[in-house]
Each structure stands twice: as structure tokens, then as C-alpha cells.
Curated annotation (Swiss-Prot):
Reactions that this protein is recorded to catalyse: N(6),N(6),N(6)-trimethyl-L-lysyl(4)-[histone H3] + 3 2-oxoglutarate + 3 O2 = L-lysyl(4)-[histone H3] + 3 formaldehyde + 3 succinate + 3 CO2
Cofactor: Fe(2+)
JmjN domain segment(s): 56-97
Key words of the record: Chromatin regulator, Coiled coil, Dioxygenase, Iron, Metal-binding, Nucleus, Oxidoreductase, Repeat, Transcription, Transcription regulation, Zinc, Zinc-finger
Entry protein name: Lysine-specific demethylase rbr-2
Recorded GO CC terms: chromatin; nucleus
Species for this entry: Caenorhabditis elegans
Annotated zinc fingers (PHD-type), start-end: 319-371, 1203-1257, 1411-1466
Cofactor: how and how many bound: Binds 1 Fe(2+) ion per subunit.
Any one Gene Ontology molecular-function term assigned to this protein's record: histone H3K4me/H3K4me2/H3K4me3 demethylase activity
Gene that encodes the chain: rbr-2
EC numbers: 1.14.11.67
Observed effect of gene inactivation: RNAi-mediated knockdown decreases lifespan in wild type worms with an intact germline. Results in extended lifespan when egg production is inhibited by the addition of floxuridine (FUDR) or in a glp-1 mutant background which lacks a germline.
GO terms, biological process: chromatin remodeling; determination of adult lifespan; regulation of DNA-templated transcription; regulation of vulval development
């Protein structure tokens, strides 16, 4: 960020560039052979493999700290200044509104050509252009030499090589051109030798074209021509750039007509710091690049008379002579400069180089060539753009450009690293040059500020917010003029320093290396957009930076002494860091500030579109830096932006308003000025300047451009030396450059103040600093006392300085440093003494141990003893602590020496005590090694003591033990202690022997596994048992074979195997008689398949045959029992019903379609829960008993539900005329269209209907079922289930027939007959013998049913069978057209509970304890998958089965609360609660 004075300026045309033909030829010089190396290629790695510098610190001020920018910057300065550039992230509540209308904001950006700004590239291009310029205007025909391969010779590289060999003169004298050629040519061409033609080519071209140019430069450097220097400095002053825009246009009073000058064309600029006033050019001067009308001979005789010359007798050419030989002879060889107004002439033989003939083209004298040379390269890389943009259109352009460049759809897809790498590649790219646009240096007074300003008219809904931020201290329009900013004493704004500039950036737009004007601070705020990347060098390293750049580009730095004050040169930070320059980076996001410190070189670029604003400010600590900057500017003859001394005296004038900090700094500077003025007066006296030659002048009333030293360009304020005759002015220091033709007597000394005036000002200002001086004297005395002061007293002085707002002087910082150092040491000591923080944890994977050691503690004690404050108390504590540490170390050393006498626990306790000290103790590491050795010994003994036990195979963990593989043992051996003892050596030997033995047995196991046999398994295992600790492939296979065989035996006899014998054949012969389920047989078969010995054996085939027989039996039974539209599997059909309890409770139990292929595992899966026939018999009898108790409750629940008991759950609404059927067993009512006809119903009286729950199967004839059992294994439990059902059917049929006969004879009641009939109807096998009696009793007992639903039954019978049965019945998810919550889906009431019973054989029914806990007067003892309970909430808190109370779940859930009958008897008032117990 650069600066300009806020003054009037006008738009100006583009700056004149160097002549086009040299630039065109220069481009040829760039197309050299790819094989020819250069300095650029030497530095290539830094550009193509860019490494980002380390990041500078980021600061996050609190809201309180953020309230005062100057104070906060002063607070962080001592830490941050060394980085040059730092970032400040404001508090989250700092959100200034953007005050610019993006559509109305218009600007014309500058175009930046990235490959023209880099220092190394620029140096080469400049050299080539200057060389062409010199040869062209010197009258030489210049062409680029070409080698034999057609490659253009790189003249810049050739020049550098010759210079490295000592220069042209030395190369010529020592005949080193072959060496030069050898250095120039690439290695692959050197194989063919160095061509003599090439040597002659480069020698002749160098001597003819390059050496005269170099000689001209040396002669110019040796000259001490002040007039010429003025001319050069003036020209460069015109072309000072900020991002390529003109820095200033200051006109120095002309003492003479500049030779070789021209009309000054002002450079295009956004705004100017100063404007030249009343500038007049010589009327006789022509435009640069035009030539006078002369004939080809350039003879004096042919020179036309000047226009308007009335003297016909005098030829103007008589005044022309050769400036080299001062003679006018040989007029036909006397050349005259083509620049109008320049009368310099030179003979062809006086030229350097000598011309053989009069050149046909343009010729200029050396002075005019030098003038043209000074312009070359000043404006490279920065050009005026043709298009004007507003913020919206530039945003669109910038984002599209970035997306197109990186080939993405959105700018957010491009990583930050990719942009940075591409930028540094582009600055050296010749093949694909990149140009971008940058809206830089846009003055806010003209285009507007991104911050609201006090003078703006604020409107809109955010009016108050704008007014708030218009006065905010961090508003960049306010920062330069804050009370503690030195710049606040200026009466007028300085553009870029006091008046902010704004910058509209895009991807790759760059700002080159520079420092701020007058080395002030700068602050930059990114209003919105993508990041701005900064690189910074601290002010203390500025000279390192300058030296590095001189090394990188000596041609540029040697040519421009003030190169570092321009903003047109880029240099790679990675390269600079390799040369020892400390550079750090800052990544500035939107909404963040960046601060640059005095003399901090900084540069950077933009990652994409953004809008930033910047301004300078100058805290009081800047004053001394500003003075140093003026001296630096003087050395390079750079113009000032303002007079530093003048600013200081503006502060002196306002001394009554200065704070103590500013008063002190101003007083110190004023004393320096006073002493300097005294010294200058003494110098003048020695020079002979008398008092009569002295004059008091008010310099501030003289325009800046009229009071600058003609030599160093410093704006003068305190004093000046003036030549009365020629009106020239210098500072006193440069009196010898004032005038070459006058003496001291012709000088006049002008001064601003008398010495007495300065002395009085010092006294007056000193009075304002009395309190500080007293504070300083007292603090000095305190530090110089014999006894050291206590830390508390030092803090009192610091607090006093803070309260009185004393400046951050060296004394204050000294006290703060003492306090900080002391507190830091105290904190370290306290961490050791009080164990507040454990800095290293006990983890296996440790980071680097950064803790101190005992030497570090002793060093800390010594540091505390040497400090400038008294820390005796803490030092004494630390010394006593060290004594304890030494005592511990002695104990630790004893434990290490006699480790055998210490247990592992004792050593661990010593380590734990040592860890508590939290310092590095080498004894801890030694103790840990002892622990490691003991741990290793324990691990090794675990292996060596692992012995096989007689019954180890019976251990339930036998299969899952963690054993050791060969690699584990080898690893254990490798981990053995490096310094073994006798004990560890013995363990290593044992491990090695065990491993050898185990590997031998592994071979035996391998042989067995190749030909496994069951009769050999026992003997093989006996030989392998001792390797129980070993885990290898073939021993594992034998071990697992043992385990599988044991499991198979266990499955067969349900006993824990004793593996000393294997009598499997006997067991397998019994398997057909063993009680076993089909699923268990399949499990045994699977186990056989995993056994190497039994898979495919005779025994295995026998089991497979049994399974095949059972599967065939299942198929036969399924054909007999399962209808096509079955909703029950075989077990559910053949077993007693277990769904009665939930049905009695009113629950909905869905049935799912069971049709399709018969899978035995699906048909008998409930059989997995039974392990014996006794369990099945007990289970079936229990269900039968429960059916007798509960079935009446089921009928009651179904009757109450009506059609909700239908398989559609009552959702299939119908007319009252629709036919329904009622099951004669369970009283559930069904729509006819919801029912399916069963052939069994044809055997019953017409109108008789059994529902799908009561008629689960096809009711096959008992003889068919008996036949199906033929050939089945006697021990298969599934066959027992069928046999039991056959036996039950016979008994029920016998009971039915006997009851019917006895009823006829009067010996039996109707109730007994009804029970017998119910049993017969519920039996799933049909015994035809009982059918007549059953039909007779049905017709009699259910006559009403039969008459009522005979037509409905006929309708069902005649209805065609559905082609596609329903997927499920009684399923609310399927049948409901609109979802209605069912009882089973309601949230269980707080007064009810459900006790789940797992369906294991022993827990399938309720325990007696459960029955006893039900307090119903007649408990029905229900059981099943779920039984619901309800609790009395009246006071007794007793529990009851819901079914035992006669309620359904819906009724229970609808109750407010349930009260039992006992509690109701004691109630005093009626209640709505229900009780039926």
C-alpha cells in the first residue's frame, strides 16, 4: 500500500513506453534454445515447486482490547513487529455495513502482465532492451547471433558468463573465449566439441555490441555529474509506480534546460499525490522517437538553417563541433543528435564503438541515449485497461476468468494451494503468459469508502448501524487521525496515507515488494470476497531482503538505487528464504485486518475477487522510524511525501493537547533536532558562511517542490543552503553539490528557528514530562540498588506506568521483561513444586519429551538467582525440592543395581514416585527397562510352564484358548533383553527348544491331515497333547478335529465327552433309537461335514439316510394334513393350541399363509425347543388342560367382539343382509366372503362351520396317518408327535361313542357329551368310527346354528376356491383400509404389565409361583408366549391375570383405574372402576 497527498489531479493519457522496435526485437531474444541454461533455470525449483513460508501469528483481540486500535497495536508490537505483517481477527460483533453501491461504483483497472514483474525475468528483459536501444541509437546494425543449430544466442546469459570470468577485457587478454563457449553450451553439445565458428561468433558479437554498452555504463557510474543525476532522478520520480500507476508528479525548479529532454507526458494515474504546476516544456523539443530532417550525409553543409533565422550570413552549423575532440573538422563525418534542441555532435571515429561509416538510421548522442535508457523497464507489467467496470460486472468477469483458467464450474472448487502454486509458476512463464486486471489505488475521496463515513449522508434501514461504524476507531477513515496517531497533526489529507485507497482484486492480481511511505504502519481491511495472500519481512530484516534482491537481480538494483521504493518488482519468497531472509505469510479472509509494521517489506496477490481498503497510520513509536526513513530516502535521492521535521513542529505547536506518550517522544526528537542544528551552524561557520548570509524563513509556506534539496531530494524545513545567482537549493549536508560555479560567499543560509527558540521549546515540552522523568529516576534507582527489589515493587512501577499512560519506552519494557521473566520462572518452579500439571502422560506411544531435567532445574535456580528481582523464597523451596529428587535418585539407583531383590510392584512404585516430579530422570528409563525385563520373563515363563493336563479337553474354553504361533515365539525371543541375565538366557534356551519340538510335531500333524482316519485320531492326539500351547496350521487342524468329534458325541449322548476313548460307532448304531428331532439330526450331520475323519464316512451316510427318511415322512404328513391354503405349519396342526390365552384377552393374532413347497425346517421349527419325548408329552398335556379351563373365556370374548372376530377384523363393512357364519367351537363370527370351504365340513351336518383357527388341517383318516408312519425311525420326536396324536384320536373317539351310548341309556349327561364332542371336533385326525355319533350330536346340540346358517354354508360351499389366498389373516396391517389402533398396538397402561416367557421347553408354561401371585379367586393358570396382568390401584397393590378377571385388554386399557372386589368392599363412595374377581 503506497501513498499520495490529497490534492487536485486530472486524468492523463498513458505514459510513453519505450520505442516499439526495440521491444519487438527484445522478444526475439527470449526465444533462445531450450538447452541453454540461465539464472532463471537455476532458480526454477523455487517457482515450479513453491513452498509456502511459515504463517505469521494471528491475533484475536477481546472487545475491550479492540476498542483502541493504537493501544492494541502497541501491545502486540514487540512480539509481532519481527514478522513484518500480521493478521488481526476482530471480535465477532464487528460487522461494518458495506457502504458502496456496487452498481454505481465504477473504475478502470490496470492490466498486469505477470511474467513482466518478476525480478529475474525483468532483469534479463531490461538488459536486452537496453542493449538494443544502445546499439540502435549508436548507429550500429544490431541482429541477434544464431548458432549452427539455428538457436538464437542468449545474450544476457552470455553477458553473465563473461562477467563471471572477470569481464570482457580479461577474457580477451587471457584468451578465455573457448572457456566461455564451453560454459555456455549444454553438455549434450559439448560431446561434439566446441565449434571454432561459435567461439568467433560470440567473441565478435560481444566485443562489437555488448562491451561498448558495458563500457558506457561504467563511464556513467564513474561520473559525478549532478546535473545529469538530477535529470535521471526527475525522470524516475515521474515513473514511480504503485501497481503500475504514477506515484507523483513533482516539478523541481529548473536551473537549466535539460539536454536531451522532451515534453513531459504525465503518466496515467488514478490519483496523484502532488501535481506539477505551471510546467513549460521547451518549444523547440520534438516528440520522442521523431528525427530531424537531415540528408543521409549528415554534413554540416547540408544542414538547413533554423527557421526564423534572419542572419543569412551565419550558418548555424558553424556552431556544431564534436564534443569528444572539440573540433569541427571532417564535417561529412560529423554526426548531429536527432533529438530537437540537442546540438551535441560527434565524429564517427570518435564514437564508442567507432563507426566505419555514417549510419543510415537514427543516431543520438550518449546523453540522449542515456535519457532514453532511463525509461526502459519503468512501466513494465502494468498497463491501462480499456474497459470500465462496476463492482458487479467486475465480479462476473473475475469469477468467470478464474473458473475458465482452472476449468471448474465454481470458484470455490479451486484450492488455495493450487492458486498459490499457479501464481508463482505464471510469473516466470513465457510459453503461456497470463494477464489479469487490478483495480488498485482507487482513492476513496473520489470513488467512495467501503466503510460509512462521518461526512456521508446515511439512509436506509441500517441508518443507525452506519452512523455507529462511521465513528468506529477501526474505520480506516478514522484510524490515521486518532488522537494517538502522529498523522492526526496534518491539516490536509494525504491520499493513501490519511485518505484510504480501495483495491478491487481478482485471481493472481498482485502487489509487488515494497515498504510503506515514510516507513509508516499500514492497515488493510478485506471487505468481502476471496483471500488476499501476504508475504512479509520484518523491518529489522529489511537490509537482508535488499541484499538478497541485489544478489538475485544485480542488474536491476545496480541500475536503480531506489528500486526498493517502487512497486513493480516481484520476487519468490521461497527463493528469498533460501537466501536467509525470514519471510512469513498471512492469509487475509473477508472481515479481517492486516497490519504492516515500519520498514516491513511486503508483497502478495489475491486468490480471487475481493474488495479491500487500506490506509497508513503512525503511532508515537513511529517517530524515530520516520526520522531513519528520511535519512534512507536521502541516500537514494527519493522525494518525500511530507516533511518529517515539519510534522514534528506541528506537534510541538499543539503540545498542550499532547498526551504524555506523545510528549515524551516529541521531546526526544526535538532534542535531536536542536543538537543537529547546533552542529550544522558550527559547520557553516567553518565553511565561512557569516551571520549576514543567514535568513529566517517560514518553509511551511513554500510549496514542497520548491524547497527540496537538489541532490538528495529531501523536502527541507529546518534549514537550507541557497545559491543566490542560480536559485539552487540543497540541505547543509550536501553543500558541496549546491553549485559548481559559485563560492560560499554567493550562498544564503535559510533557517526556520533560532537556536534559542528551539531550546525554549525543549524546555516547555520537558515540563510536561516531569512526572514520567520522576518515575524513570525512581525506577532506575530501584534497579541500581545493592539489594534486588521484590517482584511486587516492580509490578507497582509497571502499574503506575499503565495508569499514567506512560509511553512504551525501553525502561517500561525492561520492567515488563523482568516481571515476565520472573513470573515465567516462578510458574515453572510452581509446576515442579506443586505438581499442578503433568506434562507427559503414561502412554505407550510418547511424543517428544520436552520436560526439563535436573540440570535444567539447577539452571532455572541459577537464572532466578541472576534475575534483577528478589526470588529468594521460591529459590529456597526449589533447592529443598531438588534435595528430595536426589534422595529418590539414590533409591532408584539401588533398585537398578539390586533389581533381583526388588519385586515388580516395588519398582513400579519407585517409578510412580519419580513420575510425580515430572522432570526427565534417566533412572526412570533404567527402571522401566528392569520392568520390561521382568515383564518379558513373565511372558516367557507363561509359555515354558504351559503343560498339558489330563482333562484339559473338558475345559469349555479349550477351543478358544489364546495360544502361541511360531512367529509369536520368535518375536518373544527377539524381544529378550539386550543385556541378558542367567535367568533370561535360560528362558531363551527353553523357548528355542520348545519351538524345535513343536515344529517336529507339526510335521507329524501334517502327515495325519493328508490321510485322516478316525481310528488313528486318538493316538495322534496323544502325541500332540503336550503342544497345547502351540498354534500352527496342522496341529490346529488335529485339535479342531478332536473338538468336532467331541461335539458329535455330545450331540448323540448329551453327555460331556471323555476323550480318552472314542466309541462313536457304538453310539452311531444307537442313534436311530435315540430320542432326536429332525433339526438335531441335521445339526449332527453338519458337524460330520466339518470333520476330516467323519465326513463321508459310513456313520455319516447313516445319519444322512435317517434325515432323508424323515424328510420323506414330512412330505407324506404334509400332504395328508396341510390344505392348499394352509395358515399353520405341521407342528401347529398336530399340536394342542397355544393361542387361547391371547384370544381370550381379545388380542388379534395374525395368521400367515403357509402354502408352497414343504421345508422340514419350517414345518417342525417349534420342535427345536424340545429335547425329549417327556417334554413333548408334558407340554401337550398342559395345553390340553389349559384348553379345558380357558376355552369358555375365548367363546365369551369372541361373542362380545362380533364381526371383529372375523379374519378381516370387521373392516370389510357389509350390508345387514350379507351372510355370516359362526364357528360352532369358538363362537367367532365371519363374513362368508372372508371364509374358505374345507372338504372336512362336508362330513358334518349342513350348516356346521369351523373357523380357520379351529379347523387347522384337512383332518385325514387315521388309517392313512398310521400308514404314513411306516419305516420312520423310532427315536425321531416328530414321529412321536404324530403317534401321540393317533393315540389321542382313538381315545377321544372311544370317549365320544361311549358318552353318546350312555346318554341314550340315561347314564350320561348332555354336558359330558358336549365335552366329548368338543374334543372330537378339536382333533386333527378323523376316526370314521365316531363320525355318525358326532353328526348326531352336532345336529342335536347345534340345531339353532345349523338352521340359521345353512344357506350361508351352502353359499360358501358353492363359491369357487380363491386362486390366490390372502397373505395373512387377522392382520390389521393388511385388512384395514384406514388404520385403526388395535388393542395389541396400544401403549400398555401404567396399571398393566406383560410377563414374557421364552419358549424353552422348561419355561414354556408359567411357574407355580406366577400362578400363586395371581390373586383372582379362581386363577385359570394361563400360559403361553405372553400373559397380561393388571394391578389393583385402590391400595392392596395385588396383581391379577387379565384373563382370570374376565376382561379383554381393550376393556382394561379403557379403565381409568382398576380396583379389585376386596378394595371395592371397603370403599366409602361409589366408583366407576370395575371389578369381577
Amino acid at each position: 500500500m503506497r501513498a499520495r497527498r490529497q490534492e487536485n489531479s486530472i486524468s492523463t493519457p498513458s505514459a510513453p513506453s519505450t520505442s516499439t522496435s526495440p521491444r519487438k526485437k527484445a522478444s526475439i531474444g527470449n526465444s533462445r534454445s531450450k538447452n541453454h541454461g540461465s539464472k532463471m533455470e537455476m532458480y526454477d525449483q523455487f517457482y515450479k515447486k513453491f513452498v509456502r513460508p511459515p504463517m505469521a501469528p494471528i491475533y484475536y483481540p477481546t472487545e475491550e482490547e479492540f476498542s483502541d486500535p493504537i493501544e492494541y497495536v502497541a501491545k502486540i508490537r514487540h512480539e509481532a513487529e519481527k514478522f513484518g505483517v500480521v493478521k488481526i481477527v476482530p471480535p465477532a460483533n464487528f460487522k461494518p455495513p458495506f457502504a458502496i453501491d456496487k452498481e454505481a461504483f465504477t473504475f478502470r483497472p490496470r492490466t498486469q502482465k505477470l511474467n513482466e514483474v518478476e525480478a529475474i525475468v525483468k532483469e534479463k528483459h531490461t538488459f536486452i532492451d537496453r542493449l538494443i536501444n544502445f546499439n540502435r541509437y549508436s548507429g550500429l546494425t544490431f541482429e541477434f547471433p544464431v548458432d549452427r543449430d539455428g538457436n538464437i544466442v542468449d545474450l544476457y546469459r552470455l553477458h553473465r558468463i563473461v562477467q563471471n570470468f572477470g569481464g570482457c577485457e580479461e577474457v580477451n587478454e587471457d584468451e578465455k573465449w573457448r572457456d566461455v563457449a564451453r560454459e555456455y553450451l549444454p553438455k549434450e553439445q559439448m560431446a561434439r566439441g566446441v565449434p571454432s565458428a561459435f567461439i568467433n561468433l560470440i567473441r565478435s558479437h560481444y566485443n562489437l555490441h555488448i562491451e561498448p554498452f558495458n563500457r558506457n555504463l561504467k563511464e556513467k557510474a564513474m561520473k559525478n555529474d549532478d546535473e545529469s543525476d538530477d535529470e535521471m532522478e526527475e525522470l524516475k520520480h515521474k515513473y514511480q509506480h504503485h501497481h503500475g500507476t504514477m506515484r507523483t508528479e513533482i516539478e523541481v525548479p529548473n536551473d537549466k534546460t535539460t539536454e536531451g529532454g522532451e515534453d513531459e507526458c504525465p503518466v496515467s494515474m488514478q490519483s496523484g499525490r502532488r501535481r506539477s504546476k505551471n510546467k513549460k516544456a521547451s518549444s523547440s523539443r520534438k516528440t520522442l522517437g521523431t528525427s530531424s530532417k537531415k540528408n543521409s550525409t549528415r554534413g554540416r553543409k547540408n544542414k538547413k538553417k533554423a527557421e526564423g533565422d534572419d542572419d543569412d550570413d551565419e550558418d548555424p552549423m558553424d556552431q556544431v563541433f564534436c564534443v569528444a575532440c572539440n573540433e569541427g573538422k571532417d564535417e561529412d563525418l560529423l554526426l548531429l543528435c536527432d533529438i530537437d534542441g540537442c546540438n551535441n555532435g560527434r565524429h564517427t571515429y570518435c564514437c564508442d564503438p567507432v563507426l566505419d561509416e555514417v549510419p543510415e538510421g537514427e543516431w543520438r548522442c550518449p546523453k540522449c541515449i542515456e535519457s532514453e535508457d532511463a525509461k526502459i523497464g519503468l512501466d513494465w507489467g502494468f498497463y491501462d485497461a480499456d474497459t470500465e467496470y462496476n463492482l458487479n460486472s467486475f465480479t462476473e468477469f473475475a469469477n468467470k476468468w478464474k473458473c475458465d483458467y482452472f476449468g471448474v464450474k465454481d470458484v470455490s472448487q479451486v484450492s488455495c494451494d493450487a492458486v498459490e502454486r499457479s501464481f508463482w509458476k505464471n510469473v516466470i512463464s513465457h510459453e503461456n503468459p497470463v494477464s489479469v486486471k487490478y483495480g488498485a489505488d482507487l482513492i476513496t475521496s473520489r470513488v467512495g469508502s467501503g466503510f460509512p463515513r462521518k461526512e456521508d449522508k446515511h439512509t436506509g434501514p441500517d441508518l443507525k448501524l452506519k452512523q455507529q461504524y462511521a465513528s468506529h476507531a477501526w474505520n480506516l477513515n478514522n484510524m490515521p487521525v486518532l488522537r494517538e496517531s502522529v498523522l492526526s497533526h496534518f491539516n490536509t489529507g494525504i491520499s493513501g496515507m490519511m485518505v484510504p485507497w480501495v483495491y478491487v482484486g481478482m485471481c493472481f492480481s498482485t502487489f509487488c515488494w515494497h515498504t510503506e511511505d515514510h516507513w509508516t504502519y499500514s492497515v488493510n481491511y478485506n471487505h468481502f470476497g476471496e483471500r488476499k495472500i501476504w508475504y512479509g519481512v520484518g523491518g529489522e530484516d529489511a537490509e537482508k531482503f535488499e541484499d538478497a534482491l541485489k544478489k538475485i537481480a544485480p542488474g536491476l538494483t545496480g541500475r536503480q538505487r531506489d528500486l526498493f521504493h517502487h512497486m513493480t518488482t516481484a520476487a519468490n519468497p521461497h527463493l528469498l528464504r533460501s537466501l536467509g531472509v525470514p519471510i512469513h505469510s498471512v492469509h487475509q479472509n473477508a472481515g479481517e485486518f492486516v497490519i504492516t509494521f515500519p520498514r516491513a517489506y511486503h508483497a502478495g496477490f489475491n486468490e480471487g475477487l475481493n474488495f479491500a481498503e487500506a490506509v497508513n497510520f503512525a503511532p508515537i513509536d513511529w517517530l524515530s522510524k520516520g526520522r531513519e526513513c528520511v535519512e534512507s530516502y536521502s541516500n537514494v535521492r527519493r522525494y518525500l511525501v511530507f516533511s518529517h521535521d515539519e510534522l514534528l513542529f506541528k506537534m510541538v505547536e499543539a503540545m498542550d493537547k499532547l498526551g504524555i506518550s506523545m510528549s515524551l517522544a516529541t521531546h526526544e526528537e526535538l532534542i535531536r533536532i536542536y543538537e543537529k542544528q547546533k552542529m550544522l551552524r558550527e559547520l557553516l561557520a567553518r565553511l565561512g558562511v557569516s551571520n549576514r548570509q543567514m535568513q529566517q524563513v517560514m518553509f511551511e509556506k513554500i510549496p514542497d517542490e520548491q524547497r527540496s534539496c537538489r541532490f538528495c531530494k529531501t523536502t527541507l524545513f529546518m534549514c537550507a543552503l541557497v545559491c543566490n545567482k542560480h536559485k539552487k537549493m540543497t540541505c547543509v549536508e550536501h553543500h558541496d553539490h549546491l553549485c559548481n560555479s559559485c563560492t560560499t560567499k554567493d550562498y544564503r543560509y535559510q533557517y526556520r528557528f533560532e537556536l534559542d527558540q528551539l531550546n525554549n521549546m525543549c524546555d516547555e515540552l520537558g515540563k510536561r514530562t516531569v512526572n514520567y522523568n520522576g518515575w524513570k529516576e525512581e525506577s532506575d534507582e530501584m534497579l541500581e540498588e545493592e539489594g534486588k527489589p521484590k517482584l511486587e515493587r516492580i509490578e507497582e512501577f509497571i502499574d503506575s506506568a499503565k495508569q499514567n499512560k506512560y509511553p512504551q519506552t525501553d525502561q517500561v519494557h525492561k520492567l515488563i521483561t523482568i516481571r515476565h521473566t520472573a513470573k515465567s520462572a516462578i510458574e515453572k518452579a510452581n509446576q515442579l513444586l506443586f505438581k499442578k500439571v503433568r506434562t507427559r502422560t503414561k502412554t505407550r506411544c510418547q511424543r517428544a519429551d520436552t520436560r526439563t531435567d535436573t540440570e535444567g532445574v539447577r539452571s532455572l535456580i541459577e537464572q532466578m538467582q541472576a534475575m534483577d528481582c528478589n526470588l529468594t523464597v521460591i529459590i529456597d523451596k526449589l533447592e529443598k525440592w531438588m534435595e528430595q529428587v536426589e534422595m529418590w535418585r539414590n533409591r532408584a539407583k539401588d533398585a537398578i543395581y539390586r533389581e533381583q531383590e526388588y519385586s515388580k510392584e516395588e519398582i513400579e512404585k519407585i517409578i510412580e514416585e519419580g513420575d510425580e516430579y515430572d522432570i526427565k530422570l534417566e533412572e526412570i528409563d533404567e527402571l522401566r527397562k528392569v520392568i520390561q525385563m521382568k515383564d518379558w520373563s513373565d511372558r516367557a515363563r507363561k509359555v515354558t510352564t504351559w503343560k498339558a493336563t489330563p482333562d484339559m479337553e473338558k475345559d469349555i474354553d479349550f477351543e478358544y484358548k489364546l495360544r502361541y504361533a511360531s512367529s509369536d515365539i520368535l518375536s518373544l525371543i527377539r524381544d529378550s533383553p539386550r543385556n541378558p541375565t542367567d535367568g533370561t538366557s535360560k528362558l531363551v534356551f527353553e523357548l528355542q527348544q520348545m519351538l524345535r519340538d513343536a515344529n517336529t510335531l507339526e510335521v507329524i500333524a501334517n502327515n495325519f491331515c493328508e490321510n485322516p482316519a478316525l481310528d488313528q485320531l486318538q493316538s495322534i492326539w496323544q502325541s500332540l497333547r503336550e503342544t497345547d500351547w502351540f498354534y500352527e496350521k496342522y496341529i490346529n487342524m488335529v485339535r479342531y478335529e478332536i473338538i468336532h468329534v467331541a461335539k458329535i458325541k455330545s450331540m448323540i449322548d448329551a453327555a460331556i465327552p471323555v476323550l480318552s476313548e472314542f466309541d462313536l460307532k457304538t453310539q452311531l448304531q444307537k442313534i436311530v433309537n435315540v430320542e432326536i428331532t429332525l433339526s438335531k439330526a441335521a445339526e449332527i450331520s453338519k458337524a460330520f461335514e466339518t470333520s476330516k475323519c467323519l465326513n463321508g464316512s459310513e456313520e455319516h451316510l447313516g445319519i444322512l439316510d435317517m434325515i432323508s427318511t424323515m424328510n420323506a415322512f414330512t412330505q407324506r404328513i404334509a400332504i395328508l394334513f396341510k390344505p392348499n391354503n394352509a395358515y399353520h405349519n405341521l407342528f401347529e396342526i398336530l399340536s394342542e393350541r397355544d393361542d387361547l390365552t391371547p384370544l381370550a384377552e381379545g388380542q388379534t393374532i395374525p395368521l400367515y399363509f403357509q402354502g408352497g413347497a414343504v421345508h422340514p425346517s419350517d414345518e417342525w421349527h417349534q420342535m427345536k425347543e424340545f429335547e425329549s419325548l417327556d417334554q413333548i408329552v408334558h407340554h401337550q398335556s398342559s395345553l390340553r388342560e389349559m384348553q379345558m379351563r380357558i376355552f369358555e373365556k375365548v367363546k365369551q370374548a369372541n361373542s362380545a367382539r362380533g364381526l371383529e372376530a372375523c379374519s378381516c377384523l370387521g373392516f370389510n363393512k357389509s350390508d345387514d343382509s350379507e351372510s355370516t357364519l359362526t364357528c360352532i367351537m369358538c363362537d367367532s363370527e365371519f363374513h362368508v366372503r372372508c371364509c374358505e370351504w374345507s372338504p372336512f365340513l362336508e362330513k358334518l351336518p349342513e350348516g356346521c362351520f369351523l373357523c380357520v383357527r379351529c379347523l387347522r388341517g384337512q383332518r385325514p383318516v387315521i388309517d392313512d396317518v398310521t400308514t404314513a408312519l411306516n419305516g420312520t425311525p423310532s427315536g425321531c420326536l416328530e414321529t412321536h408327535l404324530v403317534r401321540n396324536l393317533i393315540q389321542k384320536t382313538r381315545g377321544i373317539t372311544q370317549n365320544l361313542m361311549e358318552a353318546a351310548n350312555k346318554r341314550k341309556s340315561g347314564e350320561s349327561s348332555d354336558d359330558i357329551c358336549k365335552i366329548a364332542l368338543f374334543d372330537w371336533l378339536s382333533c386333527e385326525i378323523l376316526n370314521p368310527n365316531g363320525l355318525p355319533k358326532a353328526r348326531e350330536l352336532i345336529s342335536e346340540f347345534y340345531m339353532e346354528y345349523l338352521q340359521k346358517q345353512s344357506s350361508a354354508a351352502l353359499e360358501l360351499k358353492n363359491r369357487p376356491v380363491r386362486s390366490k389366498p390372502s397373505v395373512s389373516l387377522f392382520d390389521p396391517k393388511i385388512t384395514a383400509k384406514r388404520k385403526r389402533p388395535s388393542v395389541s398396538h396400544k401403549e400398555t397402561s401404567k396399571k398393566s404389565r406383560k410377563r414374557q416367557s421364552q419358549a424353552s421347553p422348561s419355561e414354556y408354561y408359567e411357574d407355580e409361583s406366577e400362578f400363586k401371585s395371581c390373586q383372582a379367586r379362581a386363577c385359570l393358570k394361563p400360559y403361553g408366549d405372553s400373559v397380561n396382568w393388571v394391578m389393583c390401584e385402590a391400595g392392596c397393590k395385588n396383581w391379577f391375570h387379565v384373563i382370570c378377571l374376565g376382561f379383554t385388554l381393550r376393556e382394561i386399557n379403557d379403565m381409568h383405574e382398576y380396583r379389585c372386589s376386596s378394595c371395592l368392599d371397603h370403599a366409602d363412595s361409589p366408583t366407576s372402576s370395575v371389578s369381577t374377581d
